[in-house]
Amino acid sequence: MLLLTILPASLMAAMLGGYFTWMQLSELQSQLLQRGEMIAQDLAPLAANALGRKDKVLLSRIATQTLEQTDVRAVSFLDTDRTVLAHAGPTMISPSPIGSGSQLLSSTGTDATRYLLPVFGSQRHLTSPIIPAEADTLLGWVELEISHNGTLLRGYRSLFASLLLILTGLAFTATLAVRMSRTINGPMSQIKQAVSQLKDGNLETRLPPLGSRELDELASGINRMAATLQNAQEELQLSIDQATEDVRQNLETIEIQNIELDLARKEALEASRIKSEFLANMSHEIRTPLNGILGFTHLLQKSELTPRQFDYLGTIEKSADNLLSIINEILDFSKIEAGKLVLDNIPFNLRDLLQDTLTILAPAAHAKQLELVSLVYRDTPLALSGDPLRLRQILTNLVSNAIKFTREGTIVARAMLEDETEEHAQLRISVQDTGIGLSSQDVRALFQAFSQADNSLSRQPGGTGLGLVISKRLIEQMGGEIGVDSTPGEGSEFWISLKLPKAREDKEESLNIPLGGLRAAVLEHHDLARQALEHQLEDCGLQTIVFNNLENLLNGVTAAHETPAAIDLAVLGVTALEISPERLRQHIWDLENLNCKVMVLCPTTEHALFQLAVHDVYTQLQAKPACTRKLQKALSELIAPRAVRADIGPPLSSRAPRVLCVDDNPANLLLVQTLLEDMGAEVVAVEGGYAAVNAVQQEAFDLVLMDVQMPGMDGRQATEAIRAWEAERNQSSLPIVALTAHAMANEKRSLLQSGMDDYLTKPISERQLAQVVLKWTGLALRNPAPERQNEALEVHVGPLVLDHEEGLRLAAGKADLAADMLAMLLASLDADREAIRVARANQDVHALIERIHRLHGATRYCGVPQLRSACQRAETLLKQNAPHTEEALNDLDKAIIRLEAEARVMA
């Protein structure tokens, strides 16, 4: 209380006292300066005559008299050049004023103020008449110094008086405050104690009257508050008791609900397990008859058929393949939903992946007269790591949808770099079409399961509606995102943004081609296709010159002929609507007469049509959209053809493998047996696991093909029994390969854990059977196609070097696609052979296996059974560190040479 009273009063007194003291000091200082100016002004006329006469005695007397005035410290009279004529008082301590002229100058220091005033002839009028000629003549200077000491002393006295008054007032205020605090502190202490007791829960506490009206009102308010709190507490306690009773009654209900929730959770888990098991069983049940349908369809296609029957079989095969793709989509979706889809992380080439995808889908686009274009920006890293199979699946889905929903125009696939670090690359891959477009409502429902933009009964494009959902889930699992920008009636652009780690650049993949510095004329009427083609040719080292029609191109080549700027190549992108094969053949003849090599790019659907226009189909005719690697190889061959080497090698194996086939389904068993026997294998077929175990114990086999799901003893149990029997006799393990229709990852892992060495997923093709036999036995099977004879009636022993029928079958009956796949393989053979040679010279087994495995993968999609078998055998022996590895590698080298030679002959 005392502090609250004294502190504001003290602050106010200090502020007012300080303010008035400062005002008084300022006033005294101002008066002092004015007195100094007045004294200086008065001295000027008094000393004017003396200064004019240079009368030092008179000037000294005036100066001495001036010192008698208050606060005057020193006086000086100066000549015109400021030489001292007379001085009185101590030495001046203030700095001399700076300046000149007719005005009074002053300079203020800490203890004194110094004045300097010029004296002119006009100031003599006080003692003598004014002489006009001397009115403006400078007679001298009056210098005066005024001391601040007197002023400061008066200021200190005023300050002391102010402080004395302030202290007196504060003492009086403190006395009053003490008396008032004594009358307030007692009641306040009582209030404080009462509030403290209320805080501690003593709500019965009440305050008595405190002696004043205000305090009594405060006490009354506190008492009412205490009574209210007491009543509220009693009501709260009653509520708590009631709530406790309610909780006690509800505990049993909550416990029952928890039990029900636990049961529901177990039921949900069981339902999920049953769903997964159902999908696996359905996969088996559907794939098993599909295996028979596809297998026997292939067998029927080898027999003598009428054209109509062959078409019927093609329809059956296509329908079965479509059904299989639908099943695969549903199973992929189920695996993603269950979180069981595992992504690979292997190196791949982005440009090859994108262009290969477009190559596979080109026939469908060209059948609708659509233009397919791939643009890979040059700053985009090509060597990346990830899951190329799943990325290809996503791109295939996006491009397929674009083809499906585009009636005319262009489909452009772009790959560009968004951001880059030393280790990673942020990519944006987009597929843009000129199709029907999507509304905002369609876009919102686009990435939902079993949903399509048009779900009406009259919709034309088909599908399960799972493709985009699977793509979205895959991209999200890769850590990226997928989206679409679309305008109804104008088209759509589906894009994916994905961050992938960079891979080591494979220097061996770069082709050493003699194209650097050559000039190429380019003709392509489609703007984007022309831009993509220009980039590809420039990446090959060519200098490009673009022409807008074939006549201008021919004129340009003619004009440049026999000049330093001659054009070496002409790359023509044409369609049957733009030029006929006969007319094109004439232009090619004219260009070749000008020493200009010609390459023709045409749609896959018109490949057979334009074969008549070129001399060398292999090097001169390529399908749109052109693949960079394939284009490089073809251009290199066109500029510098290689010598043909046709070494004929020995057969790859000396005896037929002996295979045990086990399956409870007679149709599947007959199919596998027939396929193997047609390829030259000795087959023993049994139904059931018990029969398989007995057969292994009684006969010797090179390989066992074991069905997994069989009654009685299934494939796993039979494998475990065989392994136990082998362990008892210390025998080497017989290779056992599972034939399964299950596609779940955990199913495949459990098969390998049960003792099986490998697995094949139904439906099974001849190629898969031949590969697995070669992989686990080292014995190559004969190609099942009918034997052919060349012009010399040479009979092929073992697998054929080049089997067009098999290539056509692997390409789903599409001749153009089969030719493109074969051309892609042939384009990479030189680089693969050189890489294998370098790896053998360096004894780098890892690089050797990697390169052969890559070549082996490429042969799986082409009708080159002999090279495929050689790759399989070499890879198997290398992995097993077998003694016949060098022989297998030599056979592989000869197989490559034979394939190149036969390709040249067939072309």
UniProtKB/Swiss-Prot annotation:
Activation requires a sequential transfer of a phosphate group from a His in the primary transmitter domain, to an Asp in the receiver domain and to a His in the secondary transmitter domain. Its main location: membrane. Residues 814-907 form the HPt domain. Residues 182-234 form the HAMP domain. GO terms for cellular component: plasma membrane. It comes from the Bacteria. The chain crosses the membrane at residues 9-25, 84-101, 159-178. InterPro entries: CheY-like_superfamily, HAMP_dom, HATPase_C_sf, His_kinase_dom, HisK_dim/P_dom, HisK_dim/P_sf, Histidine_kinase_BarA_N, HPT_dom_sf. Residues 281-502 form the Histidine kinase domain. It is a multi-pass membrane protein. Keywords: ATP-binding, Cell inner membrane, Cell membrane, Kinase, Membrane, Nucleotide-binding, Phosphoprotein, Transferase, Transmembrane, Transmembrane helix, Two-component regulatory system. It catalyses: ATP + protein L-histidine = ADP + protein N-phospho-L-histidine. PROSITE patterns: HAMP, HIS_KIN, HPT, RESPONSE_REGULATORY. Its EC number is 2.7.13.3. Pfam families: HAMP (PF00672), HATPase_c (PF02518), HisKA (PF00512), Hpt (PF01627), Response_reg (PF00072), sCache_4 (PF09984). The modification 4-aspartylphosphate is found at D707. Forms part of a two-component regulatory system GacA/GacS(LemA). May be involved in lesion formation, swarming and in the production of extracellular protease, syringomycin and N-acyl-L-homoserine lactone (acyl-HSL). Required for pathogenicity on bean. This is Sensor protein GacS. It comes from Pseudomonas syringae pv. syringae.
